[in-house]
């Protein structure tokens, strides 16, 4: 098979291979041949690195070469060629099932065919891939590491369009790319840099080996190291890693095709495209890291393949391994390293002194040696050790007479293993520095000897287990006898002192402690005989073993919180004893005396009486002395007593008290005069855990009594069981210590501690004995047990256990109140403080503190009168006209006047009411109609009264109200008092209006309308603009600002200056000061400039100070300096004053001022003159100086042209310089950037408008036309500019002159103003003080006059110059007027044409995109508007409803966004409202819970009050009986009693009502013997008739109130919730019969839901009990009113039922009205509840039911029917109760009528 243009021996593009490449191939073959020669030692290996020869790595490794795709491997496969040859056959067959054979199988194209061979006609064999497979891999797997240098591939077909070469150095685990090859690198391998590479390790993509030509024998060559790239270090690890390979892979990724496969996917088309490779050459050599020059066949590799590059290195430099990658065994002294040029890096042999043949390398050792040696010897022999076997092993030492390499150099140590260190180890070698001697034994610390075989002195017991060898003699120096040997050398036993024992003399003998250097060594324990359990103690601390709660080393102290009981601790108070007829005598203790008794007091024991003491809780079984404490009643009193002990049973003979006989339990004693205690003559034996009764009987008594004094027995205080301590073992022992203790106890009479309650201070002798006694008796100390409420601390006195009590508290534990105190609690006890005037005794009840009161006295301390009385101790009834129940206890002034009354006796109406409530007149207090009554929201009067003449009510209006009924707002006030809740408020006008002016403020809003005192604002709270001050103080003054120093924006004129409204500070210009802005700040000047003051800027060293003249700015210069700031030379000089000043050299004929330029010396020339000295005519002027005249008018035109050309020339020069420096780009960078920006704008407009190419072209053409026209117009305008330039110059000069005149004029005006100001000052000042001002003003005026004359009359003067300039300007303008008009006309025509052309341009497309319509219609008819269209408000109109433009869309989006924002805001508001409602609901629920809990607490507290109230009621009934049955009970009194009884509120249950009704009926029936007192009632009957008339009038008023009752029917349910429907129904029937109007009002309260509650039964009961005497003042006429009340109640009850019916129909509509009315009724309900305080328990159930109804009504109105049923049930009960009450009232009326008819 032949390929087009294919010719052997040619490279790419058919060219012959270069001779260098051919020579390289030949050398490679030669090297491969030499590699197979016998091994010879190349001299280069001894001097540095050496490398094996290079060859073809494929030779001999055909079996390691694989391809991922080969044609015909499984079956024959046809393929075709692309050729222009004349051969007819173009398609062939591939059959690679068998290897290639030129004779037998020439069509086999396996991958092994590419291995180089020198067989003839080798082009007949090649490798070929399958048809149409673009991704093919050729891979070589080597058996070891090799150096890879380059690769040559010769293709039979087209070279691949894309391929890459990869390598692996770890046998295929990881791969790295060498090079990419592609016809189109950017498409096949994006992101890969393009060739050529810049560095030797760059991975690039190369295109020169991927072109489609040549079609055959094209080559691909790759070199790992490009010769053109310098390599800095060829031996570096990176270079070695780049060359090292174990696998090489060629990935063919894309085929070259002719494009027909894209159009025709048939198999025949794909048969032309495949990969075919003639030859593959992979050059390299064996990789040995420079340690070998030859290689041998690797294990498993063919050994005799011709030309094969073997893989197993024949290593040099003491290395080993397949690639010489390791050091040989025993050559590990240096780290392995690749060989380098000039350095072999050979592995070095380990130094082990001939004691081993094995070692290893240790990097840590190598680094520690400074990179010198890292070999560590392994398995040292001959008893050696160390890194180099240079030391002897432990327990061996080096023989100094032998060499280290001698096998017998190390000898064993000869040391006693028990006494030497480390079990017999010796020094291994000599080292004078370390003090080592070879073979020397190292003894333990306490061992000596050559072989360490004996102990040191003072030590014993040589042992191998002891780390120190021997033990020190364990002898305590404090317990050892000094001067002798410490211990036995063998046993270690020490020699001890007399009181010391133990093996080491380290312990004291029993009963001793404190081992020390004393002669005896220890001290006795000396434990307390009572406080310690035994005489033993701790040897170290001496601490004895203490009994319970005893502390101290000797147990002689009491633990804090515990105490040592006194000998009289076992005390039984007589007050607590039992006995018949015993009298307890309590006694108060004064602060100044010490009580001689215990407990509250005494028990009086008379002859023959017995008192029985119950004795329990004794501490131990022993004899007790019986001690009786008493107090005589008469002088020299004596008594005979008998004490009998009653035991619970017979005494056991084996018990401690088994020796007691029955006769021993009866003891008699005699009380002698002048004694306070008795010790019975014989003790008694008692045991713990048994209860005894000790009965004390008074047999007889006598004494020296006064004749009037009788014997009253004895006062017994207490009985004390005092332990008979002398029988204790501490006193009764036979030792000397016990005898000494007893002698001391008796000598110092220590037993007398328990005789009397008062304790004397203990002596130092008795105190320890008593502590020991008490510890023995009570087995230690007793706990304080201080009562936490009555004591100040939990600790008590250690002697006796008395706790620190709070005030008023007594007892050892502070657990009871002292006599005369009560109320034991956390604060202690309170003193009784019984009133000496009202109490029978100074002692009170211990719990409540109630003192025993005298008759008439009342209260806890009996210190005030009963309720309803005053004047303690002479109590008398309160006089309150029946309007109050209590009065001041001291003055008698009534408290809590009812029915709107007030005054000391409730004799007048309170504010807001009128009438005469005094009893003789019986009037009522009625509300003042101003315009409504008090309590309403429309009551605006302080008081009112009835006019005696007109009988009209006259209102005294509150401030701010006026009118007959105070129904309007007064002047100076606003509001609408006619509306509910409306009121008049003071117009807040800061006192700046006329309070009498009705139009001063708005009567509805309160806005101030007529502000005075230069104020303004809605409240006249601000000064007017131009005024300042405090508006609230009427002190607004006009702003007085200096115009020159004030900001003109804030002060346009003197009449309207805006200063600070509070301080009057004017808004000053910069650096202007003063309240009126009238002077410069310090160091500033030029106040008259009108722009603020300028800094003086005086030179710091050349001026005398920083200040300058306020008007001229001239600083005060030192001599030789001048200028305004003194920084220049002095006048008429110039130059640098620091160097030299020169005189000005100016021609006086040409200057306009004598001073030249201070820096340059240039003279200031007058117009038309120039030159340095001003001695020449200036440019544009002609003539001979000084006569200089202006040039012709044409000079200005040409001069403008010349100046313009000069400017352009300068710009061109600048551009040329920039071109030379930065090039074209730099010179025109700004232009380019400008053009780029405009192009970007054009592109944005084009893309935004989506303009077509045609429209764009038209726009461009139109733009060019406009640009051309504008250019022409610009040229014409330039000409006009040139013509006007001269005019402008002249005009400028004229303006300059006029500006000078203007400044002069301003200065003159300023001078005039200043003179005016000075004149004003002179008017108000003295003449002498103003003289200087006048003189200064005169000088200024003279100077001003001179300057004005110079400006007007001087030649030349500014005025004459201005006139000349004006004339020249007029001539010039007249001359150019015609040309100007002609040019102007031409410009107008050009602009017209441009305007017409502009009108032809259309923006309809843009208008349609933006606004939604083309915009060609007029704005008035255009639905969407457009450019130039405006709405009625003058705003641009674009878009709208139905318009789809961008503007409409944006408006729609904006509208939706705003709507969404509004919705979100509304949602937030609603959410906040919901949150607040939830919070309010939660708060109400918590309040309801609190109210319920409070109600429950009150119910529990009232439980006990009910029984007390019942008892009081029973007592009250009995008092009523007694009062009514006694003689002298008149009808008034009887009627008052009945009325008060009826006034009692009916209790909750019908049974209680029945019981009360029965009692009232019984009381009425019991009235008798009243005929005798009829004569006393005549006057009362007449008053009763008057009251009857009042009752009739009240009834008529009640009928008028019927309408009001109907209007409040809707409030029934809500009022029932507040007070309880049932409670209101029951209580509403029991009305107060005392007053008809009050009865009617309470019936109306029943209709409205119990608006006011009745007084409680218990309260009324106490009032009735206290006012029995006052009842006689009441009137019998009230009985008639009761009948009327009965009828009214019946009609009211029927109206209530009708209201209930209407309520069910209207409750839905009137719920809000009910709620409002209920809130107004709440105050009355609360007041009623306060008055019903004593009946809480009885009303609790009804109140709870009412609260339940309230909760259900708040939740839903669905429970309304249930409430209705409950109300009907209560109404039924009410009917029954009303029937019972009518029977009672009838009985009362019958009795009253009998009395009335008997007169």
UniProtKB/Swiss-Prot annotation:
One of its GO terms (biological process) is neuron projection development. Residues 286-349, 350-412, 413-472, 473-524, 525-555, 784-831, 832-877, 878-927, 928-986, 987-1038, 1039-1095, 1096-1143, 1144-1190 form the Laminin EGF-like domain. Residues 1191-1410 are annotated as: Domain II. One of its GO terms (cellular component) is synapse. Residues 1444-1799 are annotated as: Domain I. Gene3D superfamilies: Galactose-binding domain-like, Laminin, Tie2 ligand-binding domain superfamily. Keywords: Basement membrane, Cell adhesion, Coiled coil, Disulfide bond, Extracellular matrix, Glycoprotein, Laminin EGF-like domain, Phosphoprotein, Repeat, Secreted, Signal. It is found in: Secreted, Extracellular space, Extracellular matrix, Basement membrane. Residues 1257-1304, 1473-1527, 1577-1791 form a coiled coil. Residues 1339-1365, 1679-1701 are annotated as: Disordered. Residues 46-285 form the Laminin N-terminal domain. The keyword Nuclease does not apply. Laminin is a complex glycoprotein, consisting of three different polypeptide chains (alpha, beta, gamma), which are bound to each other by disulfide bonds into a cross-shaped molecule comprising one long and three short arms with globules at each end. Beta-2 is a subunit of laminin-3 (laminin-121 or S-laminin), laminin-4 (laminin-221 or S-merosin), laminin-7 (laminin-321 or KS-laminin), laminin-9 (laminin-421), laminin-11 (laminin-521), laminin-14 (laminin-423) and laminin-15 (laminin-523). Binding to cells via a high affinity receptor, laminin is thought to mediate the attachment, migration and organization of cells into tissues during embryonic development by interacting with other extracellular matrix components. Laminin-3 (S-laminin) regulates the formation of motor nerve terminals. This is Laminin subunit beta-2. It comes from Mus musculus.
